[in-house]
């Protein structure tokens, strides 16, 4: 593979969806943002995803049309095999990844994988979770506790406390720095 798979991870409320939406608005000739296939309604949540029924999801998985798939929070998530075509064509591909399923991505993509962990200070994360209004106070506390204890090892860290524009700029800088380093090896 000639492209890099950027596996973007972060706690719920860390700003992954906003970051990916903004990234899609930027003109990047060799960078694509992959949509996830999810067994939830297209109108649910803020992520731009492809909604599938469980039957559709399992059909795609059974036909090896998903490069990666996992189950979390009562839903099934997948990334289509089209990302492999994009990577082979030399594109870098950004995926809204799962922290718990990073080992699965590492096993499949090995040195082509660039894991990036989006981090937000607890105060800002709490504020974002409260503002979106999807969780009650105890659910917010549980999400904050999980975010504090669950940071993958061996991944680049991107702080998302600042503006969305700053975070996208930082992400693009991280990607380009890794490309330069990889080209020099």
From Swiss-Prot:
Pathway(s) annotated for this protein in UniProt: Metabolic intermediate biosynthesis; 5-phospho-alpha-D-ribose 1-diphosphate biosynthesis; 5-phospho-alpha-D-ribose 1-diphosphate from D-ribose 5-phosphate (route II): step 3/3
One Gene Ontology MF term: ATP binding
Entry-linked InterPro entries: GK/Ca_channel_bsu, P-loop_NTPase, PhnN
Cystine pairs: none
Superkingdom: Bacteria
UniProt KW keywords: ATP-binding, Nucleotide-binding, Transferase
Family: Belongs to the ribose 1,5-bisphosphokinase family.
Protein name listed in UniProt: Ribose 1,5-bisphosphate phosphokinase PhnN
């Amino acid at each position: 593979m000639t492209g890099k798979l950027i596996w973007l991870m972060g706690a719920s409320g860390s700003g992954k969806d906003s970051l990916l939406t903004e990234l899609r608005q930027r003109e990047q000739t060799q960078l694509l943002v992959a949509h996830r296939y999810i067994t939830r309604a297209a109108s649910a949540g803020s992520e731009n995803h492809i909604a599938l029924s469980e039957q559709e999801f399992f059909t795609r998985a059974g036909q090896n049309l998903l490069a990666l798939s996992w189950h979390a929070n009562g839903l099934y998530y997948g990334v289509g095999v089209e990302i492999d075509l994009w990577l082979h064509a030399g594109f870098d591909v950004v995926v809204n990844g799962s922290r718990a399923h990073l080992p699965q991505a590492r096993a499949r993509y090995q040195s082509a994988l660039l894991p990036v962990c989006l981090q937000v200070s607890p105060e800002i994360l709490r504020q974002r979770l409260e503002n979106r209004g999807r969780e009650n106070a105890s659910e917010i506390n549980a999400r904050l506790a999980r975010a504090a204890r669950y940071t993958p090892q061996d991944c680049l860290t991107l702080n998302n406390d600042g503006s969305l524009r700053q975070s996208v700029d930082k992400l693009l800088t991280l990607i380009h720095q890794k490309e330069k380093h990889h080209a020099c090896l």
